[in-house]
Curated annotation (Swiss-Prot):
Stretches the record annotates as Type DYW motif: 493-587
Protein name: Pentatricopeptide repeat-containing protein OGR1, mitochondrial
Pfam families given in the database record: DYW_deaminase, E_motif, PPR, PPR_1, PPR_2
Species assigned in the record: Oryza sativa subsp. japonica (Rice)
Organism classification: Eukaryota, Viridiplantae, Streptophyta, Embryophyta, Tracheophyta
InterPro entries listed in its UniProt record: DYW_dom, E_motif, Pentatricopeptide_rpt, PPR_At4g14850-like_plant, TPR-like_helical_dom_sf
Mutant phenotype after disruption: Opaque seed endosperm, late germination of seeds and plant retarded growth.
């Protein structure tokens, strides 16, 4: 057999290598036949397969082979780098690579080498290494490579350095769709969903910036929908949906799943379910069902969440996310027995979130002893969130002893957030124990803990309007305050009396009524009434849970003004219509 024929024969064997023994035998054959040095292309392809093999000993053997080569080629380095980037320990692998290969620059890395290294640094969120690799990109003169710069941008974004990611993007003279997608996803998944949407609109209006024949793809749409879902911008979400239709992406299952999530989080349950039912049954995935069940749950339709869970086809096995979504639905609807039944029948090991939902379910129902017993009998120690859940239940039912126990546990765990103090203070205030309230506030001051201010915002004609309690910063604040006076007058005719028990301060009754009147969600609703046509649905998002008085007021406004009002608070959705709320006053 000729040398070239032998090489071709060995090449044909590469796809058949299935075990570490096969790889070692192939390596030995390369050594004994002389092909290891004579055919660098074959060697690099072998290294690539070896480095990516799932066997735990394969990658170390690939690195050993690389270091044994007297004159390794760049392709050899890239094969090892690719394996390192995909390995379970990219940080350790990068350290090994930086210490033994890159400083000597033998072999000389190319754009592909740096791309694999950047993927590894992104996986381990190593911003420092990304900066060093960025310097190497400039030093080696490969800063014109669009794919490499896209990977650099992506690495910065995944390391949380969105400013550097944007700088790389802005300095690029040529951008392909992957470049736009990387920054879109980075902004949407990071802390800048508003910037992500602005970037999406820029892309939507600037197709000429993409190379010829390139179009937005499912990654583009999913990132934009994620941003809409986070902020609760229904109109923007609908625009993204229409945009997806232009490119035939609205039938893509991944896009559909994101649409379900977006519509449900923007308060349009009906649209979310329309998208779910538009997916062919055979194409519906676990993610599709999880998104639809979560949609029912967050809107307080626990019974519907249970029914959809029971209707899941046998080919789809529920996972932890599925069970959590169903349990949340039971929790928001007060379906205690159903929730316990689902929890006790779980086919996956429950985690802290599952236990936390059960504790909340029992706590809301007033079964505080069972809730406490669940906390102390779990197979792992309760975390801060679980004790906060129990503290919230104690506050809801005014049980001082349990509240103090939970607060002490939180202190032992090192929790020092405003919510812990506020809940305990509220329990004391509900019992008119003002000295204890003062003591809690003194502790907050001494620990430099500040209460997170409540705020609400609403979207009118594509513009977000934000309000805080007692806000007078809005340009139309005087109109808003006059509208509130009219609201109070009209709903008083329907029997409204301010629930001053929600004002947890030792002040007079008149002062309490004034404090209640100008809560941020009331300001947002009042603005919506004067800024939108009669009959239009009002949508409000609040960063904290809605208070009892605002809940009553929203119900009465929906009746007095003939409006549907949808409020998304920290925990769930409330849909107010004709004097009723979708939560059935269980929240």
């Amino acid at each position: 057999m000729s040398v070239s024929a032998a090489a071709r024969h060995l090449e044909s064997l590469l796809p058949r290598l299935a075990s570490l023994r096969h790889y070692l035998q192939f390596h030995a054959r390369l050594l004994t036949s002389g092909h290891l040095g004579a055919h660098p292309g074959l060697r690099a392809r072998f290294l690539d397969r070896l480095a990516l093999s799932p066997h735990p000993a394969a990658l170390p053997h690939a690195l050993l082979l690389l270091r044994s080569l007297p004159t390794p080629a760049t392709n050899d380095l890239n094969a090892a780098l690719r394996g390192l980037a995909a390995s379970p320990h990219p940080a350790r692998s990068l350290l090994l690579l930086a210490g033994r290969l890159l400083p000597a620059l033998l072999p000389r890395p190319d754009a592909l080498s740096l791309s694999f290294a950047l993927k590894a640094s992104a996986r381990c969120s190593d911003a420092h290494t990304t900066v060093q690799l960025h310097a190497l990109v400039l030093r080696l003169g490969v800063a014109a490579d669009v794919r490499l710069l896209t990977t650099l941008l992506d690495s910065y974004a995944k390391c949380g350095d969105l400013a550097s990611a944007r700088k790389v993007f802005d300095e690029m003279t040529v951008r392909d769709v992957a470049t736009w997608n990387s920054l879109l996803a980075g902004l949407a998944q990071g802390t800048e969903p508003n910037l992500a949407l602005a970037l999406f609109h820029r892309l939507a209006n600037s197709f000429q910036e993409l190379p010829s024949r390139e179009e937005p793809n499912e990654v583009t749409i999913v990132a934009a929908l994620s941003a809409c879902a986070q902020i609760g911008l229904l109109k923007d979400g609908m625009y993204v949906h229409e945009f997806a239709k232009r490119f035939g992406l609205d039938r893509n299952v991944r896009v559909c799943n994101s649409l379900i999530d977006m519509y449900s989080k923007c308060g349009s349950l009906s649209r979310a379910l329309d998208v779910f039912h538009s997916i062919k049954p055979e194409d519906q995935t676990l993610v599709s069902y999880n998104a639809a069940i979560q949609a029912h749950s967050m809107h307080g339709h626990g019974g519907d969440a249970l029914r959809l869970f029971d209707e899941m086809p046998t080919r789809i096995e529920p996972d932890g996310v599925t069970y959590l979504a169903v349990l949340c639905g039971c929790n928001h609807s007060g379906l205690v027995d159903d929730g316990l039944r689902v929890f006790n029948s779980m086919r996956v090991a429950p985690n802290m979130k599952h236990y936390g939902t059960i504790v909340d379910l029992l706590g809301r129902a007033g079964r505080l002893t069972e809730a406490y017993d669940t906390v102390i009998s779990m197979p792992f120690p309760a975390d801060i969130v679980l004790w906060q859940t129990l503290l919230g239940a104690a506050k809801m039912h005014g049980v001082v002893e349990l509240a103090e126990l939970a607060a002490n546990k939180l202190a032992e765990l090192g929790s020092n957030v405003d919510g812990d103090y506020v809940l305990l203070s509220n329990v004391y205030a509900s019992k008119a124990r003002w000295m204890d309230v003062g003591r809690v506030r003194d502790t907050m001051r001494s620990n430099d803990v500040r209460k997170v201010p409540g705020f609400s915002y609403t979207e009118i004609d594509g513009v977000m309007h934000k309000f805080i309690n007692g806000d007078k910063e809005h340009p139309r604040w005087q109109e808003i305050y006059r509208a509130l006076e009219d609201i109070v007058s009209r709903i008083s005719e329907l029997g409204y009396e301010p629930e001053t028990s929600n004002v947890l301060h030792d002040i007079g009754e008149e002062e309490k009524q004034y404090a209640l009147c100008y809560h941020s969600e009331k300001l947002a609703i009042a603005f919506g009434l004067i800024a939108t046509p009669p009959g239009e649905t009002l949508r409000v998002i609040k960063n904290l849970r809605i208070c009892g008085d605002c809940h009553v007021v929203a119900k009465l406004i929906s009746k007095a003004y003939g409006r549907v009002i949808v409020i998304r608070d920290r925990a769930r959705f409330h849909r107010f219509e004709d004097g009723q709320c979708s939560c059935r006053d269980y929240w």
